[in-house]
Amino acid sequence: MDEFHRCGKEDSFWQQCFLYPLFFQEDLYAISHDHYLDVSSSSRPMEHLSSNDQLSFLTVKRLIGQIRQQNHSIVLFVNCDPNPLADRKKSFYSESVLEALTLVLEVPFSIWSKSSVEGMNECKSFRSIHSIFPFLEDKFPHSNSILDARIPYSIHPEILVRTFRRWIRDAPSLHPLRSVLYDYRNSPENLQRSIIVVPRVNTRFFLFLLNYYVCECESILFSRLKRSSHSRSLSHGSFPQRTHFHRSIKHIIIFSRRNSLKSIWSLKDPKIHYVRYGERPIIAIKGADLLVKKCRYYLLIFRQFYFHLWSEPYRVCSHQLSKNCSSSPGYFLRVRMNPLLVRTKTLDELFIPVLITNEMDPIVPIVPIIGLLATEKFCDISGRPISKLSWTSLTDDDILDRFDQIWRNLFHYYSGSFDRDGLYRIKYILLLSCAKTLACKHKSTIRVVRKELGPELFKKSFSKEREFDSLPFSSKAAARSQRERIWHSDIPQINPLANSWQKIQDLKIENLFDQ
């Protein structure tokens, strides 16, 4: 991939206009063949890989010729088996050709995405979850409303192919992509599956589609923005995963659906801030309610105008930060008033005015966390700890280390909240679940386990938190923890928990609107 990327840097025009000959390079299929073996070896025994499954250029011609009738929508992210093409054709070469197709398409996309970041000197972009929380802490207190949007999950395959034509001039190179999309869409497995956010099908190919689709939506959206600021960010190699980033917007022009050249609203200096966590964008706005309604309407017609997608109204929700909470990313986000006493002394009198400032107050979702722990069999639905039976075959140290890792991840991720009392209820559940698991393993009771291990039970488990001053082991540390907010650098470890909880929240909203 790096070799192809270097060739593309030397001559980007050749890269954009003549991608099709890359499909007939033996090195390309050798790379995809090795990559497929590396991925499949972890899930499939090597004896299942037949030596007769060989790649040939005839396979490419077959794939190009299988353009199906374009009368359905393609579901990009569905919960189905990891290898839909292999399930349907039972062939080894289909996955290798799909890997080769991904390698070819990644080259111009990587060059285009990096050049767009370097050329847009007026955009401020960060692509890390570590920048999201400080951004929310800095920008949300100065906003009064937010728009909670959701990226649509389905798109017609032909529309997706035509969007590729905007930056790939070599039309024949898109024939294999069109064939793969229609072939995947017409498979019977995909017509009966529910739509989810995280792609599980051919991780490299569908992650590329996800990154491209999000990048295309945002590039068109932010092409309408003027007078913004820009900050360079680190590149992500040959495959840019645009997972988390935010942008600061100072000017936006809203265009009519019927005539894109006629502006119907001009929002000057509205102080709009855009942040995206995974596939969930959030727009913070400081302005009147009319401004919020205009931006919400713009987001709804934007997808219909450019991608011919009908967006349900509940996919773009508006909230007032002073009254309601927003659920992202893994927090209940709200803004609270923080009174400050300012002592002013003159020669004659002493004045103590009260200044009211806004402050972001992320709330730990205790009840959803307990529900997720109940799903993983650490407790029941009411929060009563139970033993983890699937771990009783492990050693005592492994059991303690696993519980310790769960608590450490939870404590790190939610350390940004001032109110951490609910976290110690989670700690209590994990401690008793750990003790019950050990008691079940040794066929004894919790009292016997605690008597035999003594203080070693609590020294081995949940000991990592002692390294942090924010934990209230003393009154001084407790007072300091109420004034300080610490975002730890390893918070991405808890992303699966935040994503699972976010899916539950999205499902509740969809069910509410379906009723």
Curated annotation (Swiss-Prot):
Keyword tags: Chloroplast, mRNA processing, Plastid, RNA-binding, tRNA processing
GO molecular function, one term: RNA binding
InterPro entries referenced in this protein's UniProt entry, alphabetically: Domain_X, Maturase_MatK, Maturase_MatK_N
Gene Ontology CC annotation, any one: chloroplast
Main location: plastid
GO annotation terms (biological process): mRNA processing; RNA splicing; tRNA processing
Domain of life: Eukaryota
Pfam families from the UniProt entry: Intron_maturas2 (PF01348), MatK_N (PF01824)
Places the protein is found: Plastid, Chloroplast
Functional description taken from the UniProt entry: Usually encoded in the trnK tRNA gene intron. Probably assists in splicing its own and other chloroplast group II introns.
UniProt record similarity statement: Belongs to the intron maturase 2 family. MatK subfamily.
Protein name, entry field: Maturase K
Gene transcribed to yield this protein: matK
